Amino acid sequence: MDTSDKEYLKKEGYPLMKGAAQFCKAWLVSDKNDNLITSPATSPENQYKLENGFEGATLYGGTADLAMIRECFDKTIKASKVLNIDADFRAQLERDIARLHPYQIGKKGNLQEWYFDWDDKDTKHRHQSHLFGLFPGNHITPSKTPELALACKNTLEMKGDETTGLSKGWRINLWARLWDGNRAYKMFRELLRYVDPDGKKTEKPRRGGGTYPNLFDAHPPFQIDGNFGGTAAIVEMLVQSNENEIRLLPALPDAWDSGTIKGIYARGGFELELYWNNKRLDKLIISSKLGGKSTLIYGNQTKVIQLKKGEIQDILW
């Protein structure tokens, strides 16, 4: 859908998406409120702790499961519409997505990870799988779901920044999606913190993430997720197109007060060049590989563009 390659979507993408959606549908059951939940469920590698001291990992209605299912159903529905096929199955997904157990905000203002408002056994646990809807998912955003976005922010604040490379790479992207460029940049710098492979000259323990001299993300032995996550985060700090619009410099850190980026792609087949000075966007050069319409957002400014295939526009701000 992001490239408008309908042939690929029809032959490869949609069958895979539909199969995943069918699997998820078979996994769902109704709770006492007639909401759909997963059962059994876990939240990857994390555990909860009850007031009576009981610790567990298995439950039902885990937030991470439901976040991924929301994203899967939403994308499958959209793909079905693009291809104009499977209207009956699409209708089933539309009914089911409306019945999914809703997100819950806990007593501490955090996004609940569990079906109930339970505490984590480890309050600083490296995983934040229940924030999937914010990133890499697209259905939680500061503009469209501000209360949920704030709950995600509170969750990240509670967990802190010190974590493994995999998790640090993910959290940089989460902060970028929350439009907090300085926090994202802080963690990006920590991701690049030197780690001695022999553990003799390391500033902080390996569990805190960092980078080996060969630029591999430190864990040990190696977490490529940290490398990929850090790279993705640079893009997310400068351009976001996860809400159908193209948002320019949404999480620009103070440290990058002036700069240029070329060859960055946005959903819909748009290629961008951005030029900024003193933390202000000066110029955008945008071209369309497919032809189409989009909305550009920079701060409080909005511009609607319509480009033909191969057309290039220079836009001054």
Segments from the language model and where they lie:
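C-terminal substrate/ligand-recognition segments
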Residues: 1, 121-200, 220-236
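Secondary-structure transition/capping motifs at alpha-helix termini
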Residues: 1-11, 23-35, 143-144, 178-185, ...
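The feature captures the catalytic groove of carbohydrate-active enzymes
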Residues: 1-11, 25-91
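Long, well-ordered core segments of solenoidal/helical folds
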Residues: 16-32, 97-108, 151-161, 188-200
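Non-catalytic C-terminal accessory modules of carbohydrate-active enzymes
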Residues: 26, 182-317
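Glycine- and aromatic-rich loop/turn segments at beta-sheet edges
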Residues: 29-42, 108-115, 164, 198-218, ...
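Carbohydrate-binding/catalytic loop surfaces
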Residues: 35-62, 111-123, 178-179, 217-225, ...
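Long, low-complexity segments enriched in small/aliphatic residues
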Residues: 90-131
